[in-house]
Amino acid sequence: MRIIEKMKLKGNSTFWCLAGIFLTGALPLFTNYCLNSSEVSYQLVRIENMKDYLSAGIFQMAMPVNWQYEHGTAGLDGNLFWLLPVLLRMTGAALESVYRMFLICIYAVTVCFSYKALEEGFQNKKTAVIGTALYCWAPWYLDALYGRAAIGEALGYAFLPVLLLFLVRAVGRKKGKLPQWLLLAIAISLLLQSSFAVLEVGMLPLVFCCVYYRRQLLEKDGWLTLGKAAAATLLCNLWYLLPMLRYLVAYRDVAKYVGSRPFQEKGAFLLHYLTFFFQGGATYDYKSNGFQGTAAIGVGPALTGLFFFLLWLKFSGALQKKNSKEDSTAGLFWCGLLGILLSLGSFPWDLLRQNAVFQVLTFSMQSPAIFMIPAICGLTFIGCGLLNAYREGKSATEATILETAVLAVAFVSTQFLTNKLLLGRAPLWIRQKEDLPDVVLIEAPQFQMSAAAGAAQLGAVALSVLGIVGIVIYCILTQKKDPDRKVRKEAA
């Protein structure tokens, strides 16, 4: 909200550009019904079920893996942020209205956080706005919101720019208002409370950049930052991690069963990255149906076009700029290419999942297509880097033509997809509990927290609260000391 207020106060057109990005991508939410997606009924039942439990004094911390579907449908998605629609529902608001309001909030967060990360990474507002459009209009993300209603994954995607912001600052040796270790702890905590699957995928850019930029991230201060972030994350999320550990131990057979099911056949084709216009279909079984009625997964034609334009500039010798060691673009780009490889159905996932470690790591994922997330991040950063380099090496007119073309392609393809979803998906009219379909939720007592919880659970909650309070006090005291040090240095 502070970002929006600052842009309004400055009278900057950036606010209206971001508002346009938001309105374009959130178009299917401005109706009085829900689009009938593959998992929207599940999510509506989830809200109503949480409301009933909360009325009885029980908070469901996370959703267990629905093994009946042979994949991790909302598996280990946290319910902390779902308190927003649940509390609105408890005030008497219509069920589908609170669901759409929740999605509107998620999309607004995606726009704000992605702009912040890109603006700090490239120090150019125009580039950041274009990058925000590319990130927020990615077909995979729009399909997660409206096609599959995989809200946990969409929520994790919205918070992922916080992790990217940490990487931008760490690689560039920049400092913000928050300490680096706290920023990383917040990023991991947000992903953990959103989706376990996105948390695992989000760790891929972090681990990859730690190896790629080991001089910046794995020096003495870097190890200290990672250690403090890990300790803060464990302490502040102990109330959540302890029940999850108990669940994984109690239902290890379920995890092993789901983790051993066919997974590779649900991977994407390379053609998904090259297709310009999707029909907004609902088919995710690409091995059996190919592209017939395929869902709109991919990075978008604008990012694909920028990638091939980059290759042409590189091989033609028109782009001679070398990447700086303090620029995170190159590392995220190579990580994005790795994400493309991991998302394909030709990657030997089924062979790897014969190992128990890979079964545990991937049992909460629905398909390899979730690795499109780092692919989108990497291509967005390299695309923004290309726009910056092109602006420096070419005339203002040529740079403006390229930027306009990128935005036009992204806008037209997004309009095509959202309109296809609106025109092709049947409306789902659900106002009250009686309108809900018969969807059975898998319950796990390990995830139910109430006043009658055991001593271990209450102790974990107390430690987490004390940890959060302690970190806040530490940051306040640290910020007070820094101005004093600056004053002393200036006086000296």
Segments the model singles out, each with a brief description of its role:
Residues 1-28, 398-407, 465-491:
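Start-transfer (signal-anchor) and selected internal transmembrane alpha helices
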Residues 45, 141-155, 257-264, 338-378, ...:
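Membrane-helix boundary/interfacial segments in multi-pass membrane proteins
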